[in-house]
């Protein structure tokens, strides 16, 4: 909804056509119908609509924030701008600077308020959005980094992996329980595996990349001894 009400969109280090097709479709819709300008820091490739690349470096974000380029004037003249940042941009060494300085910049110019939020992060996994909603993950909480440091240093004695997990875990003396339907990295190193159905084999509520809760009805029944997640 915010995308459809925006009068300017700035993409930073993301390719919504590949990372979030529905978001990209919404952007294309407003670009075609309302002719709103779309800009990008970084070259995302073919997005199926017109956009202008205003730079490819962190310096270009600095120039925007400090009103040191022509685009800064264009951005500040808009009433409802939207910035969409990709996770890949936040994974850079300058990622924390990018996020914090943009927040300060947008708050200063009242682009973040109860009525409008100009700052958006395009997560690469829908589960990231759900974990943020549950306050299990935050882009600003230092405890997140402490957790990953402890994981890398094998400081945990017990790990419970729920669902498909793409974490790089070097098993040492941890006791690992894996609950899920796919034989991913977590299942390979688990001491105990609790088989559960795939999402197509059980009813459930899921949060998508836009933060919308969607209901899923099972299309088939699980095989073998697999039990639904809530029963486990």
Regions flagged by a language model, labelled:
Residues 1-232:
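Non-catalytic alpha/beta scaffold blocks inside enzyme catalytic domains
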């Amino acid at each position: 909804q915010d995308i459809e009400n925006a009068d300017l969109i700035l993409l930073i280090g993301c390719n919504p056509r590949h990372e979030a097709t529905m978001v990209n479709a919404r952007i294309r819709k407003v670009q075609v119908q309302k002719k709103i300008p779309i800009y990008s820091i970084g070259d995302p490739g073919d997005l199926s609509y017109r956009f202008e690349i205003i730079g490819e470096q962190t310096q270009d974000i600095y120039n925007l924030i400090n009103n040191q380029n022509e685009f800064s004037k264009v951005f500040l003249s808009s009433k409802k701008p939207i910035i969409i940042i990709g996770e890949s941009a936040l994974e850079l060494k300058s990622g924390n600077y990018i996020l914090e300085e943009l927040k300060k910049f947008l708050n200063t110019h009242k682009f973040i308020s109860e009525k409008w939020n100009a700052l958006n992060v395009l997560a690469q996994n829908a589960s990231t959005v759900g974990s943020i909603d549950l306050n299990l993950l935050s882009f600003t909480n230092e405890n997140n980094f402490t957790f990953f440091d402890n994981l890398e240093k094998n400081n945990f004695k017990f790990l419970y992996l729920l669902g498909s997990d793409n974490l790089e875990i070097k098993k040492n003396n941890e006791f690992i329980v894996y609950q899920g339907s796919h034989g991913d990295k977590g299942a390979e190193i688990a001491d105990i595996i609790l088989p559960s159905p795939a999402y197509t084999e059980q009813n459930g509520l899921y949060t998508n990349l836009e933060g919308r809760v969607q209901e899923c009805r099972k299309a088939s029944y699980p095989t073998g001894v697999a039990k639904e997640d809530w029963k486990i």
